[in-house]
């Protein structure tokens, strides 16, 4: 007697890995999104009709309404609660063929965006192709033709809004996730997209045109070192120019004040009270895209010890790189223009030396605070800080021919902009979502995350508390940690979690079936934190 074993399901899972058939609303939603993408594809090949405003608004409307309809029908037909059914089996979310194809498409788009914008249709003599499709919206907001960056900003914002709506429906039972997602949607739309474009419209005023000045792009929520370009000489010249400020109601001084104040006051203060989550999960555009568009891929983050070691050294290497680049840029500017400011090159070198040597001394004398930092890390950090200090002083005393750190400052800046600002944060950071998870850039390369992580690690009240007695070791928390933290290992020991890499997204607590984890603020004393900290 023959048995067809392939027809017998031996699984005890209540959730079938085989995707269900889509209902009518879902099919209509997918068809609408497909039609919108088809219009974008037509625009890529330079169809004349693509330059019509109706073509652009039609594509955006079809994609938006289709995404909303599909999300609503997917999540609102069932009871509230996180459902990741089949995510480990679907080809697009399990590093299958569709996942690789999706990754290649995104990576190719970013390569064209950063290095070959003409292939997307951007031209100073008149846009064509895909970029030309966005001219109507660009004229509406700032009165000039679209650039590849305007096109990208529109795509980026639209993705966060549509998929943020989907995320809210999925996590609608969690007040924390609703508010957090609404926050990143607001900051991306208002601060990263609309306000900079409205500011760019000032460039069309007769006064600024007559003065030959332009308002530099400025995203008020971007904080150094994420906006590594903010303290470049040309921007400082514009922000401190009396004529520019008189024509823009002191906009330049406001931008400079926000840029400096956010680095030295706002960011450390908020990180002390709330941890790095205030920025990485509530404000940052990179984090916003990772939490919304990247949500289906969060389980792909590598949880291995090897990945953690690479992460630790790589992200802090990027931080060292941008510190060197910023010191070189600011010093070169003050060396040539220091007479115009109370902070001249002498004062700046003194500030750098005092800060870095002070941190080096504290690393070895504040034993309770830095007790869990391994000796090899202390040694490497000390050598780097002393070396940077020595090179800065040497450059100031003996440097010649405009060199800083034995190189032209603009070359250091260009190298960072290419390797980190373009390749790492863009091409790899987003293009590898379907392969390495949604926080590749945030975990391995973002210098802002590195600085906030160090503050969170040693000086913040934020931690994830655990009730180990309730843990059943299901592993959901570790599986869906997009930063690759083995949360379960802490929960099993009943050990509170204070990790430099944790962005406080709260998904580990949301997927826990026993309520073991809780995001809290606690006392910040050396003795109370030592038993709960793991670097």
Regions found by a protein language model. Give the residues of each.
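Non-ligating segments of multi-cofactor redox enzymes
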Residues: 1-495, 500, 515-535
């Amino acid at each position: 007697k023959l048995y067809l074993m392939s027809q017998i399901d031996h699984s005890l899972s209540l959730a079938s890995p085989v995707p269900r058939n889509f209902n009518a609303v879902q099919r209509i939603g997918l068809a609408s999104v497909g039609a919108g993408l088809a219009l974008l594809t037509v625009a890529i090949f330079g169809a004349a009709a693509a330059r019509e405003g109706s073509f652009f608004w039609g594509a955006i409307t079809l994609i938006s309404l289709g995404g909303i309809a599909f999300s609503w029908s997917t999540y609102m037909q069932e009871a509230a609660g996180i459902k990741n059914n089949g995510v480990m089996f679907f080809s697009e979310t399990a590093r299958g063929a569709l996942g690789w194809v999706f990754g290649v498409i995104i990576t190719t788009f970013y390569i064209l965006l950063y290095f070959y914008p003409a292939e997307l249709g951007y031209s100073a003599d008149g846009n064509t192709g895909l970029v030309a499709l966005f001219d109507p919206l660009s004229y509406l907001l700032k009165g000039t033709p679209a650039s590849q960056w305007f096109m990208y900003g529109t795509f980026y914002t639209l993705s966060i809004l549509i998929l943020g709506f989907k995320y809210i429906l999925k996590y609608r039972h969690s007040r924390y996730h609703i508010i957090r997602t609404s926050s990143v949607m607001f900051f991306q739309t208002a601060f990263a997209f609309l306000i900079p474009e409205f500011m760019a419209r000032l460039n069309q005023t007769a006064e600024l045109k007559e003065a030959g000045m332009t308002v530099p792009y400025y995203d008020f929520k971007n904080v150094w070192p994420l906006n590594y370009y903010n303290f470049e000489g040309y921007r400082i010249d514009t922000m401190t120019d009396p004529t520019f400020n008189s024509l823009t109601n002191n906009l330049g001084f406001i931008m400079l004040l926000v840029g400096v104040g956010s680095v030295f006051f706002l960011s450390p203060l908020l990180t002390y009270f709330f941890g790095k989550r205030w920025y990485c999960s509530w404000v940052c555009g990179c984090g916003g895209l990772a939490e919304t568009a990247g949500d289906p891929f969060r389980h792909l983050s590598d949880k291995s010890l090897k990945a953690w070691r690479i992460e630790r050294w790589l992200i802090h290497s990027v931080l060292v790189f941008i510190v060197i680049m910023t010191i070189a840029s600011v010093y070169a500017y003050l060396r040539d223009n220091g007479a115009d400011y109370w902070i001249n090159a002498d004062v700046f070198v003194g500030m750098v030396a005092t800060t870095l040597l002070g941190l080096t001394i504290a690393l070895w004398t504040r034993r309770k605070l830095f007790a869990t930092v391994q000796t090899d890390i202390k040694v490497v950090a000390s050598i780097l800080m002393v070396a940077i200090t020595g090179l800065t002083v040497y450059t100031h005393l003996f440097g010649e021919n405009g060199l800083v750190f034995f190189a032209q400052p603009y070359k250091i800046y260009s190298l960072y902009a290419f390797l980190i600002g373009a390749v790492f944060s863009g091409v790899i950071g987003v293009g590898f979502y379907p392969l390495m998870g949604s926080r590749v850039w945030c975990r391995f390369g973002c210098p802002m995350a590195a600085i906030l992580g160090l503050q969170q690690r040693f000086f913040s009240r934020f931690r994830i508390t655990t009730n180990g007695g309730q843990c059943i070791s299901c592993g959901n928390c570790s599986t869906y940690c997009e930063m690759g933290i083995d949360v379960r290992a802490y929960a099993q020991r009943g050990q509170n979690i204070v990790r430099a890499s944790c962005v406080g997204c709260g998904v580990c607590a949301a997927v826990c079936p026993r309520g073991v984890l809780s995001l809290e603020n606690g006392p910040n004393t050396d003795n109370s934190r030592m038993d709960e900290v793991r670097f």
